[in-house]
Amino acid sequence: MIRIAIPTGRMLEQTLDFLRNFDKKLLDEEKGRKLRIRGERFEVFLAKPWDLPLYVEERVVDLGIIGRDVILEQERNLVNLLSLPFGYCKMVIAGYPHISLEKNGKEIKIATKYENIARKFLEDKWSKIKVIKLNGSVELGPILNISDFIVDIVETGKTLKENGLEIKEVLFESSACLVSNVASFVYLRDEILSFVKEVRKLNDKCN
């Protein structure tokens, strides 16, 4: 049986619906407050999105389903098997309409919970940046005048508009990804590759 961690939060229902295509017994399980759901093929663990990559890397589980944004931010030693057809969002720079992205020689302040992504994508864009880590609503950065822009994921952009902000630039598009750790990929190679093949077939049908 393959142990797989899936994220709580916005992608939970989509992820469970996706896995039920490959393990019908998961349909019989009521989630409730359970953090572990046992199917016929998978043993599923519900984890906080930011903890999930650690569980995969440390081989607590064999596979994980997590957003590309978290993978790029944490830079853990994972085997990225393939992208999945849900969990779509965009990583963007956003700010007030009247503030331009043009270089002006000043230090640019960025509010974000994605510190590594902000530095990776923006240090080449601006010579001087200051990344301000926020764990809550990053839209407060410009509102409270502690940052010029924010870097964050958006799905519809509704929250940005409600707070008077607009997308300045899309850094990359993100979706859910299926990942493994090196050890599990070696020892469960046949099972994992068989599952990946089934996922690809389902993806082809959906496209």
From Swiss-Prot:
Entries under PANTHER family matching the protein: ATP PHOSPHORIBOSYLTRANSFERASE (PTHR21403:SF8), ATP PHOSPHORIBOSYLTRANSFERASE ATP-PRTASE (PTHR21403)
Gene this chain is encoded by: hisG
EC category name: transferase
Segments traversing the membrane: none
Subunit structure: Heteromultimer composed of HisG and HisZ subunits.
Localization terms from the record: Cytoplasm
Gene3D superfamilies xrefs: Periplasmic binding protein-like II
Reactions listed under catalytic activity: 1-(5-phospho-beta-D-ribosyl)-ATP + diphosphate = 5-phospho-alpha-D-ribose 1-diphosphate + ATP
Main location group: cytoplasm
The protein's name: ATP phosphoribosyltransferase
